[in-house]
Amino acid sequence: MGLEKSFILFSLLVLVLGWVQPSLGRKPSVQDFKRQHMDPDSPPNSRPTYCNQMMKRRGMTKGSCKRVNTFLHESWATVKAICSQRQMTCKTSSRNNCHKSSSTLHITDCRLKGSSKYPNCDYTTTNSQKHIIIACEGNPLVPVHFDASV
């Protein structure tokens, strides 16, 4: 009887872990990338409130303030095409699934101001034209992670 209960409890535990684990170890997705980084319809602008508005609108100030984020002011086709560039090691990890843009892109960098604390997330807005490095996955390859701008 005790062995039977243990088996039932173990089976239940395996089921629960199988249900919970995918959300814990969730891989980055193309939808996350688009939400966090794509803003093709807005040209880069120097409005100091751009980052504050966009970070909040895109859900990056829920529960805490995301420290750094980059928005890309290019078409999805332009960004996706970077995945066809030569593969390289990522700058922020040892993964080897990154690709660097062959030309500079219009970007906006958002950086949390040093004195800013949740829930009042306050960002500096910096526009520039830089090469970007993104991680790509899947078949066909699609952007899933913004790695760096150089």
UniProtKB/Swiss-Prot annotation:
Coiled coil: none
Keyword annotations from UniProtKB, A to Z: Disulfide bond, Endonuclease, Hydrolase, Lyase, Nuclease, Secreted, Signal
Signal peptide as annotated in the record: 1-25
Single GO biological process annotation from the record: defense response to Gram-positive bacterium
Subcellular location: Secreted
Active site (catalytic residues): H37 (proton acceptor), H145 (proton donor)
GO terms of molecular function: lyase activity; nucleic acid binding; ribonuclease A activity; RNA nuclease activity
InterPro entries per record: RNaseA, RNaseA-like_dom_sf, RNaseA_AS, RNaseA_domain
Catalytic activity: an [RNA] containing cytidine + H2O = an [RNA]-3'-cytidine-3'-phosphate + a 5'-hydroxy-ribonucleotide-3'-[RNA]; an [RNA] containing uridine + H2O = an [RNA]-3'-uridine-3'-phosphate + a 5'-hydroxy-ribonucleotide-3'-[RNA]
Keyword S-adenosyl-L-methionine: no
Keyword Aminoacyl-tRNA synthetase tagged: no
GO cellular component, one term: extracellular region
CDD domains: RNase_A_canonical
Binding residue positions for substrate: R35, K66, R67, V68, N69, T70, K91, R111
Cysteines joined through disulfide linkages: C51-C110, C65-C121, C83-C136, C90-C98
UniProt EC number: 4.6.1.18
One Pfam entry name: RnaseA
Similarity comment: family membership: Belongs to the pancreatic ribonuclease family.
Function summary: Endonuclease that catalyzes the cleavage of RNA on the 3' side of pyrimidine nucleotides. Acts on single-stranded and double-stranded RNA.
Subunit structure: Monomer.
Protein name listed in UniProt: Ribonuclease pancreatic delta-type
Organism from which the protein derives: Rattus norvegicus
Species lineage: Eukaryota, Metazoa, Chordata, Craniata, Vertebrata
